Each structure stands twice: as structure tokens, then as C-alpha cells.
Amino acid sequence: MNARERDLQKGLRLLHLLHQTNPYPQGPGTASQRRNRRRRWKQRGLQILALADRIHPLPDSPTEGPLDLAIQRLQNLIIKDLPNPPTSTPTAQASTCIPPIWDQLVPRSNPSSSQGCGRDSCERGEDLVGSPQESGRRDHCNTQEDQTRG
């Protein structure tokens, strides 16, 4: 490690220590006490940022060298001619090639007439668990009739 890298590491350790010495304010108190603690915490944080900028100033603009190199590389790019598209039409085998995951899928069958119209049908002879409904039970879909009776 050369001297520049050691100085940089030392500065970064100092910045890390400075940030650790200013934790976010915690604790009970009235709203104005909490507000004042947050205000002082923010002021200390701004002072730490000012010190950090003095310890390790960031460059104002990126160096010119890498940008010029990138521009030169972009200028050297060449668009090549694309090959001619294929003239033959696809064969029947290519159109029937189905990925293996789709090959195993089986379409759902339509529900039988004894099961009603679908999942939410009230005319079904079975409830959601699959056991037959009791004959004494009222149809739970006719809630308006139940409300007018009661």
C-alpha cells in the first residue's frame, strides 16, 4: 500500500467514527423536546458532512481520460450487415414442437349437470368439502328470502 491509499483509509476510518458519534435521537419527552433533539442531531450531521468534505473532498467532475477513451471505443463500433432471412417456409414438425412443460398439461373438463354451473353455484349437491348436503338445510344463496322471513 502506498502513502496515498493509507491516507485514504485513515480518512475513511475517521469519517466512519464521526458518523458513529451522532446516532439518531431516541427517548421520551414532549413533542418540543423531541423536535429540538432532532434539530440538534441534524445540525451535528451537517457539521459532520462539512468535516467529511474537508477530509476527503470529492472531485467536481470526472477525469477526462476515461470519458475520451469511451468515446473512442464508441466511434470504432461498426454496424455489420445482417444475413439474409431464410427463404424456406417452416415445416410441420417445427410448428408441432411443444415445450415439454406444456405437453403434460391437461385441459379442465366441464362440470357435469349434477354439479351445477361452477365453483360458486348454489345448486350443487355437495358443499365445498365434498360431503352431500343435508336435506333439512336451506339454500344459503337465498339470503333475501331469509331476511324477509325474519
Curated annotation (Swiss-Prot):
Recorded GO CC terms: host cell cytoplasm; host cell nucleolus
RNA-binding found in the keyword field: yes
Comp. bias intervals (Polar residues): 20-33, 107-116
Annotated motif Nuclear export signal and binding to XPO1, positions: 69-80
Signal peptide limits: none
Biased composition regions of type Basic and acidic residues, renumbered to the chain: 135-150
Chain segments carrying region Disordered: 19-39, 102-150
Molecular function GO terms recorded: DNA-binding transcription factor activity; RNA binding
A Pfam family that the UniProt record links to this protein: REV
Motif (Nuclear localization signal and RNA-binding (RRE)): 33-47
Swiss-Prot/TrEMBL keywords: AIDS, Host cytoplasm, Host nucleus, mRNA transport, RNA-binding, Transport
GO biological process: mRNA transport
InterPro entries xref list: REV_protein (IPR000625)
Top-rank lineage group of the source organism: Viruses
Subcellular location(s) of the protein: Host nucleus, Host nucleolus; Host cytoplasm
Chain spans, region Homomultimerization: 14-22
Gene3D superfamilies (UniProt xref): 6.10.140.630
Subunit description: Homomultimer; when bound to the RRE. Multimeric assembly is essential for activity.
Domain notes: The RNA-binding motif binds to the RRE, a stem-and-loop structure present in incompletely spliced viral pre-mRNAs. This region also contains the NLS which mediates nuclear localization. These overlapping functions prevent Rev bound to RRE from undesirable return to the nucleus. When Rev binds the RRE, the NLS becomes masked while the NES remains accessible.
Function as written in the Swiss-Prot or TrEMBL entry: Escorts unspliced or incompletely spliced viral pre-mRNAs (late transcripts) out of the nucleus of infected cells. These pre-mRNAs carry a recognition sequence called Rev responsive element (RRE) located in the env gene, that is not present in fully spliced viral mRNAs (early transcripts). This function is essential since most viral proteins are translated from unspliced or partially spliced pre-mRNAs which cannot exit the nucleus by the pathway used by fully processed cellular mRNAs.
Protein name (record): Protein Rev
Organism: Human immunodeficiency virus type 2 subtype B (isolate EHO)
